[in-house]
Regions:
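Active-site Gly/Thr loop motif
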Residues: 309-312, 356-407
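N-terminal leader/targeting segments and the immediately adjacent pre-domain N-terminus
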Residues: 26-165, 193, 222, 260, ...
């Protein structure tokens, strides 16, 4: 069921039928290249949109009891309300507000609900893990909203920042990719997908005749399709920046409509290229194969069985399909639950939801990414020491180390942008320090 927050009803009378004209609110004209005169007109249009949209939202809130009747997160988002969907270009305060509330404002994005488990399983507390790291300094440098360490099945560190707490939801960005790939494994075991060597177009007929016609499910999972894509987060003309504003062809899903027009750059299986668009297609493939929305299948195969403590949401495209490559909103503890679920083989009543051998393949290097010691599996970033991670822009992550029974969850809003090199390096160093702390503790227990 599409998530319709209370604010949706609060805004209906004030805004009329604005949602029927998405181009009026969701354009990214302020960032588009063009002649100086055109650019000035575009910037003026955006300013008028911001004024109109701000008045619209405040009027809607006031009409049903006023600003202070809204929850803190929604007030924070409205106070810095972005004028478009191009979050790659939002200001730091806008991101701070929005990352905890993307699913609160349907004018920005709509979502489907993933209900909490009927049998929630709170994380048991453990002894604090002795760390040399100054946690306060590390979190300040990362601009962390949440930092959790689960080791040996127990919660050994749980800290929050940016005026966020564990009761809220924080967006996943590309961490969702690893959730989507897990649903591929589930669909394979359930018989909805016959083989990873099947053609993608067997499941998404609208891709027939496109560059994806001869691409296998496996190649899509490992981002080795050979289809051209630009994932440059700093470029407003990149595919990752433009596809949200694409107007789909009549009768086609928005995500498929954009991807089917892309040209081939290399033969299938010969080159790895990171592409959020390809994971969007993975999500579409699962939906087409199972006949179920991704949110429904996630609730059935993961959220319920794993004992998730809170509701989650999954943002949907203009045509109403969950965006497989991005944007689950969940509590930090439930991200930790997901890490534990994967660490323990995604088992329900002793049986894994994925086929035998799935995790060995999914979490080890299937594609060379050009970094010694690292690779890419089935939508997981892999390390030669056996650890692996789900990663999202601006500092989202679930790091899993089976050898040490370790899960680390990070939610953040990096100051240096989507792929802040300094913040990324500091996080990798933190992972190593946690691993060393676990090793030292285990050694002391043996002595």
């Amino acid at each position: 069921m599409t998530q319709r927050p209370t604010l949706w009803r609060q805004l209906q009378k004030a805004r009329g039928r604005v949602e029927d004209r998405p181009h009026a609110l969701w354009s990214a004209t302020a960032h588009n290249a063009g002649k100086a005169g055109t650019r000035r007109r575009q910037e003026t249009q955006v300013q008028w949109k911001k004024l109109a949209l701000g008045a619209l939202v405040v009027a809607g809130a006031a009409a049903v009891g006023g600003w202070f009747s809204l929850d803190k997160e929604t007030r924070g988002l409205l106070a810095t309300f972005p004028t478009n969907r191009d979050l790659l270009f939002w200001s730091e305060p806008q991101r701070d507000a929005a990352f905890r509330a993307l699913d609160r404002i349907p004018l920005l994005a709509r979502s489907h609900m993933v209900p909490a488990s009927g049998t929630p399983s709170p994380l048991p507390p453990g002894e604090p893990l002795p760390l040399r790291t100054d946690i306060n300094a590390f979190m300040a440098g990362q601009r962390s909203a949440a930092l959790l360490i689960v080791q040996g099945g127990k919660l050994r560190l749980e800290r929050y920042g940016l005026d966020f707490d564990g009761a809220g939801r924080w967006t996943s960005f590309s961490v969702a990719k690893s959730f989507t790939s897990t649903l591929v494994g589930a669909a394979l075991k359930d018989g909805y997908i016959r083989s990873l060597d099947d053609k993608v177009s067997d499941y998404i007929p609208d891709l027939k005749g496109s560059a994806y016609d001869d691409v296998s499910v496996r190649q899509l999972l490992t981002m080795t399709s050979g289809v051209q894509w630009n994932e440059d987060y700093a470029d407003p003309q990149s595919d990752v920046a433009r596809f949200n504003n694409h107007q789909p062809e009549a009768g086609q899903e928005a995500l498929v409509s954009y991807m089917r027009q892309l040209p081939r750059a290399a033969p299938p299986g010969t080159r790895w290229l990171y592409s959020t668009g390809e994971t969007n297609l993975v999500g579409t493939l699962v939906q087409q194969a199972t006949g179920k929305p991704l949110a429904t299948y996630l609730a059935e195969k993961v959220w319920g069985p794993a004992g998730m403590e809170h509701d989650a949401t999954w943002l949907v495209s203009k045509t109403g399909q969950e965006v497989g490559g991005c944007c689950i909103q969940a509590s930090p503890r439930d991200y930790a639950h997901m890490g534990l679920f994967i660490l323990n083989g995604a088992k329900v009543d002793g049986q894994s939801i994925v086929p035998d051998g799935w995790w060995e393949a999914a979490t080890t290097k299937q594609a060379d990414i050009g970094r010694p010691g690292h690779g890419y599996g089935y939508q997981w970033w892999t390390n030669d020491d056996g650890s692996y991670a789900a990663r999202g822009i601006f500092g989202q992550g679930i790091f899993i180390d089976p050898q040490r029974e370790l899960v680390i969850v990070t939610n953040a809003n990096w100051a240096g942008g989507a792929c802040d090199p300094a913040a990324m390096k500091a996080r990798e160093q933190f992972y190593r320090e946690v691993q060393q702390a676990v090793d030292a503790e285990q050694q002391r227990s043996k002595d």
